[in-house]
């Protein structure tokens, strides 16, 4: 295999900004919504045509509503200026989630809604022209009189969606889920089926496809003396396929929490979590562990999980993606306190549970100051783009973050500038970035405080045009 010099590798991927709305001037970016008051928590999904659809929570009318916008591959907004309102009923609507549909004709939009007083969950389908296809103001996912919180959603593979949430109908925090088809019809029981409704409280549900119309779920549970991570598989018709009270993901002593789950491509899943088995106090120093579970609910790796990182100090907020379309294992990124201030690290774990990069992870960004909330997307060339909030040079004087990103190849080599390249350095700070790949374009959206008013946050976006292939 021919290898080219590292200085050449650094030029293999050139960041190009397209014409027609996307500016190369630092701090400009593309305004998606600059309406009055705050716009928060953008979620982005491919429109199937090299562009993107972006949704957000919006307070322009005083209370919080949900809005949506579409942009093309040149950064041109295609719908109404400052977005289309999806729901503006009394009460609060927020926490938007967008799910792609297989025919590339728009998206399914899920949100949390208090129109009835207590928080419920609703959904709407939007076509490529911004037209609502289901009932005006959305169809109910769950309207139980108790509260429904922290929704997560995935595509069901058949133009529908599966949603999971935390639910208080039993006077404790349980987990329920619902499947809705492409026509907006609930397939499972009214107000959802129980993923787990036993003793104690369950937190932070995560889900992934089982590739047969159902889903695999992961969560952490405080009903046991030590907090545990559990998993469950529910079939396309809403039946539990694993133990009634869930499968124990890790049997090690100590507490576990904050799991993330992703398909293994064989109707099973990879699960990553924060692990406190080596914590000398309580929830002060977390390690990161992982497990693979097959379609039958059997653990394939060590019953205690395999180590991603067990450095001294604290590792948190793991975020995962596949290595490639053939799965190939998972790439994990996290923030890491091993060097006083938190930095960004990453690791590739193959399908057999073996770390493929440096022990305890590769440094992605070790710049001065804090780096937090890393996320990542696969770049379709067996590489990965990692992006994060960055406080380099800010040791608490401003407490405002920029957004940086790094691209790494499958060997873990950084392809962009040391410690990442800036996506946005505008004054006022950036929050909650979310990104997707569409062909060879990375699209990223975020909430932005550049206008200087902490109560008037806007939505901005930018793109990076990548070369189509990383050379070995």
Where do the language-model regions lie?
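Bacterial N-terminal signal peptides
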Residues: 9-20
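Bacterial N-terminal signal peptides that target proteins for export
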Residues: 1-10
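Extracellular, repeat-based ectodomains that mediate carbohydrate processing or recognition
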Residues: 22-472
